[in-house]
C-alpha cells in the first residue's frame, strides 16, 4: 500500500475542518497553523478535495472551506483516493506484469492486502474520527500557585 504523506495530511486536514467547521468556513491558514502543514501544500490538497466534491470553498471575507457533505457520509478511503493514486500494494500496480511480464508469486497476497486495507479505510467514516477526537481525555496541568512575595505581618 502506498499511503503517502499526502494521504495522511489530507485526512488530518479534513478532520481539522470537521472539528472546527461548525462556526462557519475554516481557513487553510487556520488548519496550517493548528496542524503544522504548509499552506501551499494544503492549497494543493484542497484543490483535489474540492474537485472530488468533498469540500466546498467560500470566497471573500470570512471565507474558507467547509465539508461538502456530512462527515458520516465520507470515509477515510474517499479522502485518500481524492488526493492520490488508488491504494495498491502490488509491485505492478495491479497490471500483473511484476515478474518478467508475468504475475509474481506473491501477487495474490498483495491484492488481498489491498482489499483488506481499502475495506478498513472505507469503513472508517470521518465522523468516527471526529467523535474519537472529541472523546479523548484531556489532561489539564495547573501551574503551581504563586507564593506571596511579601510576608504577612501580625
Question: Model-found features: residue ranges?
Answer:
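N-terminal helix-turn-helix DNA-binding core of bacterial DNA-binding proteins
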Residues: 3-37
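Alpha-helical residues within the helix-turn-helix
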Residues: 33, 50-51
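Key DNA-contact positions within bacterial/archaeal DNA-binding proteins
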Residues: 40
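Short, hydrophobic-biased segments on the C-terminal half of alpha helices
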Residues: 46-47
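Beta-hairpin "wing" of winged helix-turn-helix
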Residues: 53-67
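C-terminal regulatory/oligomerization modules of transcriptional regulators
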Residues: 76, 94-154
Amino acid at each position: 500500500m502506498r499511503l503517502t504523506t499526502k494521504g495522511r495530511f489530507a485526512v488530518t486536514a479534513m478532520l481539522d475542518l470537521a472539528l472546527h467547521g461548525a462556526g462557519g468556513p475554516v481557513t487553510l491558514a487556520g488548519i496550517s497553523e493548528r496542524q503544522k502543514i504548509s499552506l501551499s501544500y494544503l492549497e494543493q490538497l484542497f484543490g483535489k478535495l474540492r474537485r472530488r466534491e468533498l469540500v466546498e470553498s467560500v470566497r471573500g471575507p470570512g471565507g474558507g472551506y467547509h465539508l461538502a457533505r456530512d462527515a458520516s457520509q465520507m470515509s477515510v478511503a474517499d479522502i485518500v483516493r481524492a488526493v492520490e493514486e488508488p491504494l495498491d500494494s502490488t509491485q505492478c500496480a495491479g497490471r500483473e506484469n511484476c515478474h518478467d511480464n508475468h504475475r509474481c508469486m506473491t501477487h495474490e497476497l498483495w491484492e488481498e492486502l489491498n482489499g483488506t486495507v481499502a475495506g478498513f479505510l472505507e469503513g472508517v467514516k470521518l465522523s468516527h474520527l471526529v467523535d474519537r477526537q472529541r472523546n479523548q481525555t484531556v489532561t489539564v496541568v495547573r501551574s503551581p500557585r504563586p507564593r506571596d512575595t511579601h510576608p504577612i505581618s501580625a
